[in-house]
UniProtKB/Swiss-Prot annotation:
Cofactor: binding comment: Binds 1 Mg(2+) ion per subunit.
EC numbers, comma separated: 3.1.3.77
Catalytic activity: 5-methylsulfanyl-2,3-dioxopentyl phosphate + H2O = 1,2-dihydroxy-5-(methylsulfanyl)pent-1-en-3-one + phosphate
GO molecular function, one term: acireductone synthase activity
Amino-acid biosynthesis keyword on record: yes
Complex and partners: Monomer.
Protein name: Enolase-phosphatase E1
Binding locations of substrate: 149-150, 184
Essential cofactor(s): Mg(2+)
Pathway assigned in UniProt: Amino-acid biosynthesis; L-methionine biosynthesis via salvage pathway; L-methionine from S-methyl-5-thio-alpha-D-ribose 1-phosphate: step 3/6; Amino-acid biosynthesis; L-methionine biosynthesis via salvage pathway; L-methionine from S-methyl-5-thio-alpha-D-ribose 1-phosphate: step 4/6
Taxonomic source organism: Naegleria gruberi
Length: 252
């Protein structure tokens, strides 16, 4: 199916966006957010060591490291933390990032660091120009926008509040993530969104780069348009969704 034809979206009253690969380059997290943690970790630990927030972060990391040591998991060699040693915390965080762990304690610290990075201007949430323009066109039509991403609601809000196009939070009615809604590859998550918002499924258009998510949304009666961007997954030749390389191809 062609990814360049113009598609009318005038019948939809609500637009729900994925982030990575849709509004934002798919490499943004890997090439901007995670490198920021590695680059700023030592300074962050040194400068916030006495803060209650960092003390809680360190305690959570310490508890996880102790659980790892007493387990038979692949992480039983995780560096242990001495609460009097900043270097032990740094070593533990680097170890867990190298292992690409999704543990709560690590995500908590990273979230606090990203917040500081955004607030200080060291991180800007990258939003495609055509995505921003589409947000503008949607609002001019008096229609609503929601965000549904696997990234936490906090991370979503930081990206859009401190974006390359300024504070975009006023454009959005609400934010959904996998913790408050569920897995994006499951029909039940989209049913839950319909129940929570009270919006008829025929009124919503979902925009995502992931065909598996589009299939799950379709099972709940929600239409989707696939976002084809640099680095997004190649679509199967026989897929039956509309697809665009830019939101300028969507028109009212």
């Amino acid at each position: 199916m062609s990814a360049v034809k113009r598609i009318s979206v005038s019948k939809y009253k609500t637009f729900m966006f994925d982030i990575e690969g849709t509004t934002t380059p798919i490499v943004f997290v890997a090439e901007n957010l995670f490198p920021y943690i590695r680059k700023s970790l030592k300074t962050h630990i040194e400068e916030t060591w006495e803060s209650e927030e960092t003390k809680k972060d360190v305690l959570s990391l310490k508890e996880q490291a102790e659980q790892d040591a007493n387990s038979q998991s692949d992480f039983k060699d995780a560096p242990q933390i001495n609460i009097d040693s900043q270097q032990s915390v740094i070593d533990n965080v680097v170890y867990n990032m190298d292992k690409d762990r999704k543990m709560t304690a690590l995500k908590q610290l990273q979230g606090h660091m990203w917040r500081s990075g955004y607030e200080s201007g060291n991180i800007l949430g990258e939003v495609y120009d055509d995505a921003f323009d589409f947000f503008e066109r949607i609002k001019k039509q008096g229609k609503n926008i929601y965000i549904y991403s696997s990234g936490s609601v906090q991370a979503q809000k930081l990206l859009f509040q401190y974006s390359t196009h300024g504070n975009l939070l006023p454009y959005f009615v609400d934010h959904f993530d996998t913790s408050n809604i569920g897995n994006k590859l499951e029909k039940s998550s989209y049913v839950k969104i319909l129940e929570r918002t009270g919006i008829p499924n025929s009124d919503i258009l979902f925009l995502t780069d992931n065909i598996g998510e589009a299939i799950a949304a379709r099972e709940a009666g929600i239409d989707s348009v696939l976002s084809v961007r640099p680095g997004t997954m190649k679509l199967p030749e026989d897929h039956t969704f509309e697809a665009v390389t830019s939101f300028e191809h969507l028109e009212f």
